[in-house]
Amino acid sequence: MSTTLWSCNDTPDYNDAYDNTTATTAVAQKLVAGTGLIGHMIDDRTWTVTDGVEATEIAYVSYEGYTTKMFVVEVDLSNPAISIAASLPDNGTTFKMQSMTRQALAADAAGNKVWAGFNADFFNMTTGVPRGPVHRNGVMLKNTFDSGERSVFYITRDKKAAVAHRDDYPAVNASGVIQEAVGGGVMLMTEGELVTQEEEGLEPRTAVGVSEDGKTVWFLVVDGRNWSYSNGMRYQELGLCFQSIGAHDAINLDGGGSTTFLVRTTPEFTDDRFKVCNWPCDNGGQERAVGDGLLIISNQ
């Protein structure tokens, strides 16, 4: 009787089996090339939300082995029909809490058509008062910050986007240039450079970045707290993503169970015209009521 002995390959192709960084969309290709995060691309696709607004959905496994689902929304403010506005519950001026879908429905109207929406600032979960400033339609509703590392995202009266650290906000506010504004958390990028922050681990994230000329805005939404679906992102990783896609400055917004990204699915004014694209983690996929938000609007 003869015996045949088998052994494992001396040079197993573990990396070859794992690595798959082939991306089909321009945004995902930039993230693959610039972040070093993506080990295995599961899927990526880009679609046009409306003229001047492109959304990309990306699913991947990181080199650390974490599944990740993220959305990148690019807004072209040089398009004369497109604008970004701060939102409050019931399209009003009173601070309270309401889901982003309800905020979008309240603001949506002919000539002020909402195409996408995102949660924005951290807020008092009892009163709904945002932690940072709020400006709507050129009117300052709140100009103070709670303690801690805070920032602000704003749109100027000549329709340019910018972000500022809390220390720089008083001068910006005094200049009278702000048309829309919401508060945010830590700075992720400033003047093209990453800002080092004390890490808080992998979490669901909402964040916003702007180009140097203020005419392009990127929203990043990352789901988390669901091991098999998406684990979230760290601050440094968010910054790398913004840097890779071309942002000059970026800030973190409220995340966790507040993280929400919705889009309009039809130009008609049907009751179900808005769809939440991400997976809000605290309520099994159901939206959390939040203090304020940011809406992408067209005047057509």
Language-model features: locations:
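Zymogen propeptides
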Residues: 9-145
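Conserved beta-alpha junction segments in alpha/beta enzyme cores
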Residues: 59-62, 68, 72, 183-214
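C-terminal motif of bacterial Sec signal peptides marking the signal peptidase cleavage site
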Residues: 3-7
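Conserved, well-ordered active-site substructure
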Residues: 127-146, 197-212, 216-248, 258-300
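Short beta-strand scaffold segments in enzyme catalytic cores
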Residues: 71-74, 121, 151-155, 187, ...
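Active-site-adjacent helix-turn-beta-strand microarchitecture at beta-sheet edges
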Residues: 119-200
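Short, solvent-exposed aromatic-acidic interface loops
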Residues: 87-94, 167-171, 222-226
